[in-house]
């Protein structure tokens, strides 16, 4: 399974692509989309949209994983980050990719083992897990960590969803004497 991970941001959007076969991970590509701050908001969102479309076209992922926006102390920053995230979601939808979303806590826990890990710890574990020669840049490392999180957690969630659906299908409501039972 090829996973495209995205760490959305209005100034810098990180992306990382890995191949996952069971627990084996292989690095494919990563980078940071740097958006010129002089552009208007719509132009900045278009830069993110166009670049992520291109990344998806070139790397041909099977699935995408995206970090969920956290609530910042500054509501305006949170709204702007949400718009960058929206541009990323549009690019992924346009590329017909299934999108899975994870919180920063879930990503850090899946990659480092603790949800309170520092950025440097995430970078170091990404480097180790993917056998990289150097430490990836922070935005790329976060995106690769998101992809790694999905590679480790996503298949389990898929199985649980299928089991939940099967359990729901197997438990049809029953009627006895015109009343609902069980």
Curated annotation (Swiss-Prot):
UniProt subcellular location: Cytoplasm
Catalytic residue positions: 7, 67, 139
GO molecular function, one term: magnesium ion binding
Pfam entry (one): RuvC
Superkingdom of origin organism: Bacteria
Binding site for Mg(2+) 1: 7, 139
Main location: cytoplasm
Cofactor: binding details: Binds 2 Mg(2+) ion per subunit.
Keywords noted in UniProt: Cytoplasm, DNA damage, DNA recombination, DNA repair, DNA-binding, Endonuclease, Hydrolase, Magnesium, Metal-binding, Nuclease
Known catalytic reactions: Endonucleolytic cleavage at a junction such as a reciprocal single-stranded crossover between two homologous DNA duplexes (Holliday junction)
Co-factor requirement: Mg(2+)
Listed GO biological process terms: DNA recombination; DNA repair
Enzyme Commission number: 3.1.21.10
Residues reported to bind Mg(2+) 2: 67
GO cellular component, one term: cytoplasm
Family of the protein in this entry: Belongs to the RuvC family.
Role played: The RuvA-RuvB-RuvC complex processes Holliday junction (HJ) DNA during genetic recombination and DNA repair. Endonuclease that resolves HJ intermediates. Cleaves cruciform DNA by making single-stranded nicks across the HJ at symmetrical positions within the homologous arms, yielding a 5'-phosphate and a 3'-hydroxyl group; requires a central core of homology in the junction. The consensus cleavage sequence is 5'-(A/T)TT(C/G)-3'. Cleavage occurs on the 3'-side of the TT dinucleotide at the point of strand exchange.
Assembly: Homodimer which binds Holliday junction (HJ) DNA. The HJ becomes 2-fold symmetrical on binding to RuvC with unstacked arms; it has a different conformation from HJ DNA in complex with RuvA. In the full resolvosome a probable DNA-RuvA(4)-RuvB(12)-RuvC(2) complex forms which resolves the HJ.
Name the record gives this protein: Crossover junction endodeoxyribonuclease RuvC
Gene of this entry: ruvC
């Amino acid at each position: 399974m090829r996973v495209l991970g995205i760490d959305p941001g209005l100034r810098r959007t990180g992306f990382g692509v890995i191949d996952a076969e069971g627990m084996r991970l292989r690095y494919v590509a990563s980078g940071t989309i740097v958006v010129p701050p002089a552009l208007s908001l719509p132009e900045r969102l278009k830069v993110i949209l166009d670049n992520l479309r291109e990344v998806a076209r070139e790397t041909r992922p099977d699935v995408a994983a995206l970090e969920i926006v956290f609530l910042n102390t500054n509501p305006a920053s949170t709204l702007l980050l949400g718009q960058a995230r929206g541009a990323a979601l549009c690019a992924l939808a346009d590329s017909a990719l299934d999108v899975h979303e994870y919180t920063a806590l879930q990503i850090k826990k899946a990659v480092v083992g603790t949800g309170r890990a520092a950025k440097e710890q995430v970078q170091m574990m990404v480097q180790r897990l993917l056998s990289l020669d150097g430490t990836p840049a922070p935005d790329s490392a976060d995106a690769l960590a998101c992809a790694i999180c999905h590679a480790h957690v996503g298949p389990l969630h898929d199985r649980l969803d299928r089991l939940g659906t099967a359990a729901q299908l197997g438990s049809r409501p029953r009627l006895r004497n015109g009343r609902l039972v069980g």
